[in-house]
Amino acid sequence: MKLIIFTGLILFAIVSLIEAQANNEKACLPQYQVCTDAPGNCCSNLVCDCYGRYKSGARIGRNCFCLLKGVIYKREN
C-alpha cells in the first residue's frame, strides 16, 4: 500500500515538473506582432514598444508591437 502511494506521488511530481517546464518554454512573439496583452513575450532581440492613439486630442486606445531594440520609428507625412 505504501509503495502504491509513494509511486503515485512520484508520478504526480514528474507530471507537475513537465507541465511547469512547458509553460516556461512558450513561443516568443516575432517582429511586428501585437504584444499589447503580453508585453514580456517578445523574442530576445525585440522589445514591446507601445504608443497611444488619439483622435481630436482625446486618447482612444493603445497599440503595442514587438520591435527591434534601440530603433526609433518616425511618422512619415
Curated annotation (Swiss-Prot):
Residues 21-26 form a propeptide. Contains 4 disulfide bonds. Residues 1-20 form the signal peptide. Keywords: Disulfide bond, Secreted, Signal, Toxin. It is found in: Secreted. GO terms for molecular function: toxin activity. It comes from the Eukaryota. One of its GO terms (cellular component) is extracellular region. The keyword DNA damage does not apply. InterPro entries: Spider_toxin_CSTX_knottin. Belongs to the neurotoxin 19 (CSTX) family. 08 (U8-Lctx) subfamily. Its main location: secreted. The keyword Disulfide bond applies. This is U8-lycotoxin-Ls1j. Expressed by the venom gland.
